[in-house]
Regions:
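Transmembrane beta-barrel wall of Gram-negative outer-membrane proteins
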Residues: 8, 234-273, 277-316, 340-357, ...
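Short, acidic, small-residue-rich periplasmic hinge/interaction motif at the N-terminus
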Residues: 14, 26-30, 61-65, 79-119, ...
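Short acidic/polar hinge/loop motifs at secondary-structure boundaries
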Residues: 171-201, 219-220
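Short strand-turn segments of transmembrane beta-barrel domains in outer membranes
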Residues: 198-206, 215-250, 276, 550, ...
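Membrane-embedded beta-barrel scaffold of Gram-negative outer-membrane proteins
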Residues: 255, 351-355, 361-379, 519, ...
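Face-selective signature of the C-terminal outer-membrane beta-barrel domain
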Residues: 295-309, 341-492, 519, 523, ...
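Gram-negative outer-membrane beta-barrel transporters
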Residues: 408-409, 415, 576-579, 595-675, ...
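C-terminal beta-signal and adjacent terminal beta-strands/loops
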Residues: 618, 670-671, 693-759
Length: 759
């Protein structure tokens, strides 16, 4: 009597051009009309075990690569394990090869949409990166220097209060920031260095904690350069940009090991006069990025990166509509021409990743940031101080941000089905001095708030995904966050107030999650998600006012589907809701937090990606939300600036060579700027276009923003203001920063081959 061996097929998948491993490749194993699906790990490895003798067919799919099929035989008299090396050839995007359920994480089917956008849409700025998140709108209102105002799923997230942002696992949001809670300045990121975007809308992912109420976005930088490059750009109204990205390891050069290693540097310089403003913006920014990635062993990788960013700018602020109507200023004029500021951030980031023989993955990361911020603004002009004006100076006098992220992931067979367990542990600390001052023409003459703050967060999470059947998955998890707050007031002009403004407190928040996924087939996934999340409050509020919520909870829930109605079309739809215990708004003039009470938001997200021909793609995002305060009377319960209807769509032509082009629109509808809807924030429709021409080693590009030269309000608020000579009580109306007019930009890029080839 003989018994068939139980065999194993395993392998490593690499890029046929660069020889770099390809993570998250969909691998399909077929035999006797039975199919198994897996994905490669972070090191490009895959494995199928418990295989009986017979004939097998392997097919490999990865977005941006040509699919590949190969046949294998497992014979009873051969070794139990077959190891193979597979190389995939880079190729144009083909939506017919994209499967819905072939993801490393069962809950990340939405990121199929993001991956398509990353391959098709040009990104030339940090703003472009944020706009890759479906349904996310942004607004800039300080000469380009401040973090963008973010709108998503019915939230005016301010500068990040309700949207968490990460770059290579490092948090971007700043707790208890001088300009507002959760402030997320992405301008230290050079867009050409970004390799991938992971989006998690809602409160359903255990990995994300503070600020991840409307959602979270995580950007991952490239581990290597396919080509060295130099790019030069010139735009109307005095816009200049220069970029260089260079590999620093030549052929057969190594640093720490004899295995595959990469080291590259990227440097960017931006200067934008923005002369369409009467008070020229003169925005100037320098960026530097250095990254090492290497395989220390066959199972362990090391990533080390450093970032430097510095910018300086002038701003025209938000101007009241009546000042334009009365002819006091033009649309691009300024009532206080001395607005502006400076900011800088320096980052260090190191990550060690190990994949064990049993497939378990251990990740350890440490990071450090040093941050400065100095902003001069004037929101109300002469409402509070009729002599000197209401100018304020918000200042971060050197923030230290440092932390650790760790996780352990393992798959086990439990009752004949797969159970994936992820255990995570993290910490984050912020310390430094924060201040708010009264200023006139950038000369400070009074201190409103000044003190040192320390915020410490320790978090842990457990995430379990159990495959009940071949099609049904349940994901359950819980996250625990502990916060400790400390603030020491340092007012010298009013020392008698320091004790009452100082203090410490701590709070723990538990956030359970429960999600269900059903893979109807390779092209249809149904899902139902739910979970608690939160956004934290400012240290200056929680240590002095015990009645304020320290960590207000959010409950999110949604049902939906990601599916392919035809081979070359991908659709995602979700019906969602989110209840927030406490709506928090930062009052910049006095450094206080305004509590607005409970809110509920209900909405629908709809996204389509469609490949019309081999080189022509169409995309559409439509988003609707209905948000209201729960405890306010009907008609008085609008959530100010909460977006209701937004849409983005475009056509992209991307052949292998020659001309490529993109034509895209952005639309946001009118929305309430105040609770009773008596003041309206105006919507807009903008059309943008890009044309590129590629020849060997060169790319020439033309970009046109706001093709129809529409007058539009980029940032807008209901604000009580007073100009000189007006009644003391001021006037409550819409104040706004005008959006840019039509702008033409030309660019040229020179590519030269990366000669590095490590074995």
């Amino acid at each position: 009597m003989s018994f068939a061996h139980i065999g194993v097929i395993k392998g490593v998948i690499t890029d046929s051009i660069s020889n770099n491993v390809i993570p998250y490749v969909n691998v399909v194993l077929e035999s006797n009309n039975k199919k198994q699906v897996t994905t490669t790990d972070d090191f490009g490895k895959f494995m199928f075990s418990d295989l009986k003798e017979g004939s097998y067919q392997l097919t490999f799919y990865s977005m941006g690569f040509a699919h590949k099929t190969m046949a294998l035989e497992l014979k009873d008299d051969e070794v139990k394990t077959i190891s193979i090396m597979v190389q995939l050839r880079p190729n144009a995007l083909n939506l017919s090869e994209v499967t819905v359920n072939g993801t490393k994480d069962i809950g990340e089917t939405m990121n199929k949409v993001n991956n398509i956008d990353m391959l098709l849409r040009p990104t030339n700025s940090a703003q472009d990166l944020l706009k890759l998140v479906p349904g996310l709108f942004i607004a800039q209102h300080q000469g380009g220097g401040k973090a963008e105002q973010i709108f998503l799923r019915g939230f005016d997230c301010d500068h990040g209060t309700d949207f968490a942002v990460f770059v290579d696992g490092m948090p971007v949001n700043m707790v208890s920031h001088a300009h507002g809670q959760g402030y997320a300045d992405m301008h230290f990121v050079i867009p050409e260095t970004v390799d991938a975007l992971t989006v998690s809308k809602g409160t359903y992912c255990t990995k994300y904690g503070d600020f991840a109420t409307s959602g979270a976005g995580e950007f991952t930088s490239k581990n290597h350069l396919d080509n060295d490059m130099i790019k030069l750009e010139y735009g109307q109204y005095g816009a200049y940009r220069a970029l260089a990205m260079l590999n620093l390891l030549g052929k057969d050069k190594h640093l720490f090991s004899k295995k595959k290693e990469d080291l590259y540097i990227a440097a960017e310089y931006n200067y934008n006069v923005a002369s369409y403003f009467v008070n020229h913006q003169n925005y100037q920014r320098e960026n530097l990025f250095l990254k090492y990635f290497g395989m220390l062993t066959d199972h362990t990788s090391l990533s080390i990166s450093g970032t430097y960013f510095n910018s300086i700018w002038n701003g025209s602020g938000q101007v009241p509509q009546r000042a334009i109507n009365q002819g006091i200023i033009t649309r691009f004029g300024a009532l206080d021409p001395t607005e502006g500021g400076t900011t800088s951030r320096t980052n260090g980031n190191a990550s060690l990743k190990t994949v064990f023989d049993n497939g378990a993955i251990l990740k350890n990361q440490v990071y450090y940031s040093y941050y400065q911020f100095n902003l001069f603004t004037n929101f109300t002009f002469f409402l509070n101080d009729t002599v000197n004006g209401d100018g304020i100076n918000q200042r971060e006098n050197g923030r230290n941000l440092y932390g650790y992220n760790g996780s352990y992931e393992i798959n086990k067979d439990v009752f004949g089905a797969n159970l994936k367990t992820i255990v995570g542990l993290g910490s984050r600390s912020d310390d430094g001095q924060v201040g708010l001052f009264h200023q006139n023409k950038r000369v400070v003459f009074d201190t409103i708030v000044l003190g040192t703050r320390q915020i410490h967060n320790v978090n842990a999470y457990l995430d379990e995904t159990y495959q009940i059947t071949k099609k049904l998955f349940i994901n359950a998890g819980v996250r625990a966050d502990y916060f400790n707050y400390y603030f020491k007031s340092q007012l010298t002009n009013k020392p008698e107030l320091n004790d009452s403004l100082s203090g410490s407190t701590s709070k723990t928040k538990w956030s359970p999650k429960l999600n269900v996924y059903y893979n109807f087939n390779n092209n249809v996934q149904l899902f139902a998600r739910s979970g608690y999340g939160f956004h934290s409050n400012d240290v200056r509020a929680v240590v002095t006012n015990p009645n304020q919520q320290t960590l207000p909870s959010a409950l999110g829930y949604e049902v939906g589907s990601t599916f392919k109605p035809m081979q070359n079309m991908l659709v995602n739809v979700a019906l969602w809701g989110l209840n927030l215990v406490e709506e928090l708004t930062y009052g910049g003039d006095d450094g206080t937090i305004n509590i607005s009470g409970r809110t509920q938001r209900l909405g629908v997200d709809f996204s389509v990606r469609y490949q019309l021909t081999k080189a022509l793609f169409a995309d559409l995002d439509v988003n609707y939300s209905h948000g209201r305060f729960v405890d306010l009377p009907e008609g008085q319960n609008y959530i100010p600036l909460s977006p209701t209807f937004t849409s983005v769509a475009g056509l992209t032509l991307k052949p292998k060579k020659g001309f490529s082009a993109s034509l895209r629109y952005r639309y946001i509808s009118n929305r309430a700027a105040i609770e009773d809807n008596s003041i309206t924030a105006l919507g807009y429709f903008l059309l943008d276009g890009v044309v590129n021409y590629n020849i060997p080693h060169f790319q020439f590009g033309l970009r046109v923003d706001n093709i129809f030269n529409v007058d539009w309000n980029e940032a807008q608020f209901e604000t009580l203001t007073r100009m000189k000579g007006e009644p003391a009580q001021g006037v409550d109306e819409l104040c706004f920063t005008p959006g840019a007019p039509r702008i033409f930009r030309l660019n040229v890029t020179f590519f030269f081959p990366n000669t590095q080839k490590n074995e």
